[in-house]
């Protein structure tokens, strides 16, 4: 198999109902077999380009196209069998109930002989480090495991063009290296062309041939060999919001502890067991237990650890959206404010002003047809009047750089914009406790800094923050402590579950090649 060639001539796309194009004036020529890292500030159109190359962007009703974009000299819609795409949101690519069937699905659509499919499936799962039975339910996978599953499905198809949109965003550091190396082995063996969108430049900089930086104003900011772009354009790109290894983000300024309100206990877990109810089951299956954790006002706790250890399940339980599977979880009076101690028994309106939750997938919490409408839902539910409601919404639109998208459909935003909107919807109700799942996913360095600065200000006024994260910059900037989840000491079939331990925030996770930028 040979790699696919990608060409663009004055190409652009404007989503229906949007005044500004997502991409405009794009000229590209990517040769067969090239490995390209695509960078750019949040909202520069990176994901739009990937969807277009995969032939899934939509038709005339979904937007207006200008110029020409070709894969092997044909429109992308005519080249779908040659292209494999891993999306930002892994949930959107899980189509079948069992792991093996899901990976085999693409091969079946390409009419790969049956005798060849299952060896491909097994190899792809091994390559991405998803060591699970073929019959394992996809509904029981964590976000990071679903990301590996989506990649395995693409690698099993052996396409001529591999498109990866933030493929390591939800992975732990070891998983980042494992997945990157699996991709490299696959494209080396097949000769496929590789195009990657990734904010972690250090992960890919030594293994790609070329970097292309998209300009939000249209066209390309920089294009050339990796070392050349990073050395000659690094400072300019960092100023534009592109993550450059030599220019780490600056931590926010924090108020002196003597000026911050005294800490109050908000929520306490003792011997807590957390779990979920799998599809077609009636009882929760425990995924982590023996968890002791105290959350206090004005403090930030980072939930860290490998994929699949139950971090998101713990976060949802602390937020009152899942009932504990065992142990003890109680809200103190400072949070309950007259309600009972069990958050999962509170009404949704009661949760609104006490606990705000940002899901791992932003789209799971969008309800309105516009960004402005989305931000107004919480304040309206709290009974805020028109003027006060509009003032609060406008302030958040401005603070999180969403002003120009106020009338846009939330589902047409970029991944980074969706994440900022999901955080803003929670901030709109001003809860005492924020529970955030991967809050910095998809952010460029400027929007990352603004988001972290906003959370720091909330901490200084007494809001408590709990965040599931693999972002060590975020931990260093905000966290007072880490709650580190550890994998089960035995197989799940034998009843083994994950555990967790609280440690100082300064205790770092083991350094990996992903963090140092080594290949």
Region spans (language model):
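The feature captures the beta-strand-to-loop junction immediately N-terminal to the Walker
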Residues: 39-41, 304-306
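Catalytic Walker B motif of ABC-type/P-loop ATPase nucleotide-binding domains
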Residues: 162-166, 434-438
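Helix-to-loop junction immediately C-terminal to a conserved catalytic motif
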Residues: 54, 319
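ABC ATPase C-loop
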Residues: 155, 426-427
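ABC ATPase NBD Q-loop/coupling interface
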Residues: 66-79, 328-350
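Conserved ABC ATPase signature
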Residues: 137-141, 145, 409-413, 417
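Hydrophobic anchor residue at the start of the ABC signature
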Residues: 151, 179, 423
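Conserved ABC ATPase "signature" region
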Residues: 115-133, 387-405
